[in-house]
Amino acid sequence: TGTPEQAVNGNVTSLLPDAQQVGWIAGALAGLMTESGTIAFIGGMELDTTLGKYEGFKEAAAYVGEQAGKTVEALDIVYSGDFSATDKGIEFAKAMMDQGADVFFGDASAVDSGARQAIDEANAASGSVKIFDIAQPSDLLGQNECIICSQVTDNASLVGLCMEAVQSG
């Protein structure tokens, strides 16, 4: 086993969605939806893809917010250290809501589910949905009231584009 750069034949490569673009899409929506001007991002671990999503998220939110006449700032990213601790998601979301965050995005799997639980509880306590989450592909069913969209990458299309590039030289 090894990595693509260690491959001895030139026919091996890897495909990876552009994490910063994924973050940009989420950030653009966050910039439009935030009322408080404060947004939040929860990461599982400090990975390049997670950092890319966070950078795109905060950059796009600030840009789109400015275009809409408001200032949008992202709280510092927090990391749970894993991808399964829903209790950390609850803890992080509560702390970030206490700092005014009203739109969340994450890259932390089950930790994100915990965050959505805390967001839904805060919304229920206030009597209306005013705090939102931009979810991941596993959340397509919209099982939480706070979900305003779900980020989905289409790996079949990625492979198709790659094959077209190979065919065209």
Predicted features and spans:
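A residue-level marker of the well-folded mature domains of exported/periplasmic proteins
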Residues: T1-G169
